[in-house]
Amino acid sequence: MAEVRVRYAPSPTGHLHIGNARTALFNYLFARHAGGKMILRIEDTDQKRNIDGGVESQMKYLEWLGIDWDEGPGRGGEYGPYFQMERLDLYKKYTDELLEKGLAYRCYMTSEELEAEREAQIARGEAPRYSGAHRNLTQEQEEAFVAEGRTPSIRIRVPESVTYTWNDIVKEDVSFESKDFGDWVIVKKDGIPTYNFAVVVDDHLMAISHVLRGDDHISNTPKQMMIYDAFGWEYPTFGHMTLIVNEEHKKLSKRDQSIIQYIEQYKDLGYLPEALLNFVTLLGWSPVGEQEIFTKEEFIEIFDASRLSKSPAVFDQQKLAWINGQYMKHQSFEEVFEASLPFLQDAGRVSSEPTEEELVWAQNLVGLYREQMTHGAEIVELSEMFFEDELVYDEEANTVLAGETVPAVLSEFASQLRTLEEWTPEAIKGAIKATQKATGQKGKNLFMPIRVATTGQTHGPELPNTIQLLGKDRVLARLDA
């Protein structure tokens, strides 16, 4: 059996989007499950739209997610170069071959002529497509156009009456008719190949066995099959994954500001890469059974492309927050702290170069809220009461403090705290028990007034640990207020 070889081939026109990350991840899992190779190829022919640092950004956040590749930028490989702009001589070689065989031809029509043709077709109620006006130019006609200073594009001769059919990994049987396509451009006037031509040359020369991509590429597939046929090359196996939609079941748009869509943004919010990988894998793929939390190694072991969904994948941010919260609870504390500390520093609550004492305090703070956090950035909002000079009470808190027995409880608790020789959670727990014994109050009548008076909140993490971390002076000042 031939080696499984897949590719992720982004354009450096932007940063790593959640949809592109899913494409990369599914290719990665498919290859690793089969013991095959994943290739990273950069499709950088759209020079006007490429952004500075686009390639580096794609690579950085793929690696951050834990998606590694076997060949490509930073790895090398025997099928390079892996940037399309470094492969122009290869594309020219294969373009010349098609021209020599008569399977492609030069088209000298100007953009104005093409637009006029298109408008006339629309006016007649026809689907706009290239008419083939320059399909059979004589040598004299071509020479005349060249003399006018016209630069040609190169078009493929679309075969007549051919049905292009393939068995898609996701969509099953898919068919297109060649009559629905006009002769399309394979090389633009500037000599740069179009996507559907270059991608076939690259996939063939790089021995790509499976092409897994979004189903917005389905209409590209018959065009690519035309190129495979023109050279007599074998098709790879195609699989077109359903698109990602929002909760209103509309296609996820990069302009939709209500959804965070870039991997970099999630990293900057303190999400954990393992959690994001877990969530993205479940966007359009499902395992057997009800389990939802998996390690990358487990995903590699169980990944089965036949379980790719035929229905659009709904992007549920609450589900992502829940998954990340599970990882915040169970990942190593070092990783959770690393995802949280920068936010405390940015908020000015921990210095940029913390002392050992500050680090220990910050670690205790993150440990205190670890069970409540869904991502690192939340530590700032959750821990606000540690940094407020005056507490602001909501209606529920004021109701608690208005209780008849509250003054006696708070006064006794303050007295008990003043007698403590050690400021530890265990000692504070002892002070709470002593307050219970002295006042006769227990349960909510005991704990709620103490929590509200010291933290301003009716809910929160373990009370003795919270009080210990607040510090004795701050706690007594709040109790005496």
UniProtKB/Swiss-Prot annotation:
SUPFAM superfamilies: An anticodon-binding domain of class I aminoacyl-tRNA synthetases, Nucleotidylyl transferase. Keywords: Aminoacyl-tRNA synthetase, ATP-binding, Cytoplasm, Ligase, Nucleotide-binding, Protein biosynthesis. It catalyses: tRNA(Glu) + L-glutamate + ATP = L-glutamyl-tRNA(Glu) + AMP + diphosphate. It comes from the Bacteria. Its main location: cytoplasm. One of its GO terms (biological process) is glutamyl-tRNA aminoacylation. Monomer. Catalyzes the attachment of glutamate to tRNA(Glu) in a two-step reaction: glutamate is first activated by ATP to form Glu-AMP and then transferred to the acceptor end of tRNA(Glu). Belongs to the class-I aminoacyl-tRNA synthetase family. Glutamate--tRNA ligase type 1 subfamily. This is Glutamate--tRNA ligase. It comes from Exiguobacterium sibiricum (strain DSM 17290 / CCUG 55495 / CIP 109462 / JCM 13490 / 255-15).
